[in-house]
């Protein structure tokens, strides 16, 4: 048994087939099959039901994959846990929802690098649910997400900022009433696969507002550009860190009961580098306190 074989077993479970696991692990289908046969021989158990065209994990195989994941996570933590006892250095894999990538995250990372120049931050964009899965699998150290109503049991979170949702409208619109504008103008919808998109849909339903959907987008920049071009109105988060060159659009409050999205830094409770995660959280809080994207002066 080797760590490489355990990683392959985990990949088969996560990817659903030998072929997909081979692609994810950058090896051949035959190599995956051979590694799994070696594990079955060494452990003297049947990991897969091979009566189907694509072998499926048996219940025992699924249990062994879960145990293998814990072993691989502990193995991967050996060096980072030792490094974390000294000066902060090395890579941190940080996930971030796309709405934070043009203000909050770049400002926070630049602040972090001023304090710890031996740290390299590797950013992975994604939706909140995707990033939580990547943290759980050990592919990310932490992520900036829209915190859901309930976090998985093994996760911890650190509050970063509350961002009220507001209406974006073209500057030439005839009214500043968000309810009127939502009913009269085409609606540029925030991606419904995102937690924010689901919050927006729930708020529209609660207020019995029927909108005329014209398009559905994920990025704040793309949505703002469409609104600025006069193609409709949209509901998006009010950024806790303003971008350098905001689009010329109206930003209208949805009122005191408008939805608010909570940005949090989330990580696994057993993360082997707690000091690194804490440093990232502090950098994010510093960026929020600054409130606008402005690259820091290297001289301090």
Give each language-model segment a name.
Residues 183-207, 273-281, 287-297:
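Secondary-structure junction motif
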Residues 40-57:
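A short LG(V/I)-centered, amphipathic sequence patch enriched
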Residues 42-43, 64-86:
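Alpha-helical linker/hinge and terminal dimerization helices associated
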Residues 152-158, 162-163, 221-270:
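Beta-alpha-beta core module
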Residues 154-192:
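Flexible hinge/capping segments at coil-to-helix
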Residues 104, 251-294:
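A late-sequence structural motif
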Residues 10-28:
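Short helix-boundary/capping micro-motifs
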Residues 89-151:
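Central regulatory/effector-binding core of bacterial HTH transcription factors
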């Amino acid at each position: 048994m080797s760590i490489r074989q355990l990683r392959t077993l985990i990949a088969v479970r996560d990817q659903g087939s030998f072929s997909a696991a081979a692609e994810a692990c950058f090896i051949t289908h035959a190599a995956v099959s051979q590694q799994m046969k070696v594990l079955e021989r060494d452990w003297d158990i049947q990991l897969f039901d091979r009566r189907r065209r694509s072998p499926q994990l048996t219940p025992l195989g699924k249990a062994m994959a879960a145990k293998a994941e814990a072993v691989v996570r502990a193995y991967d933590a050996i060096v980072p846990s030792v490094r974390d006892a000294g000066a902060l250095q090395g890579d941190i894999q940080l996930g971030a929802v796309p709405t934070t990538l043009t203000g909050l995250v770049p400002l926070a990372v630049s602040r972090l690098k001023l304090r710890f120049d031996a740290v390299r931050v590797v950013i992975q964009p994604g939706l909140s649910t995707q990033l939580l899965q990547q943290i759980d699998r050990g592919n990310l150290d932490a992520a900036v997400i829209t915190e859901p109503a309930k976090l998985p049991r093994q996760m911890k979170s650190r509050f970063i900022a509350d961002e009220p949702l507001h209406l974006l409208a073209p500057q030439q619109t005839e009214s500043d009433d968000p309810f009127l504008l939502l009913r009269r103008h085409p609606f540029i919808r925030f991606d419904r696969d995102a937690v924010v998109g689901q919050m927006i849909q729930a708020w529209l339903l609660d207020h019995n507002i029927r909108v005329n959907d014209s398009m559905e987008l994920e990025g704040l920049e793309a949505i703002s550009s469409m609104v600025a071009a006069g193609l409709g109105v949209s509901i998006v988060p009010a950024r806790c860190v303003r971008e350098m060159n905001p689009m010329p659009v109206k930003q209208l409050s949805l009122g005191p009961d408008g939805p608010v999205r909570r940005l949090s830094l989330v990580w696994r409770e057993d993360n082997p580098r707690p000091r690194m995660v804490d440093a990232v959280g502090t950098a994010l809080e510093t960026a929020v306190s600054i409130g606008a994207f402005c690259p820091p002066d290297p001289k301090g």
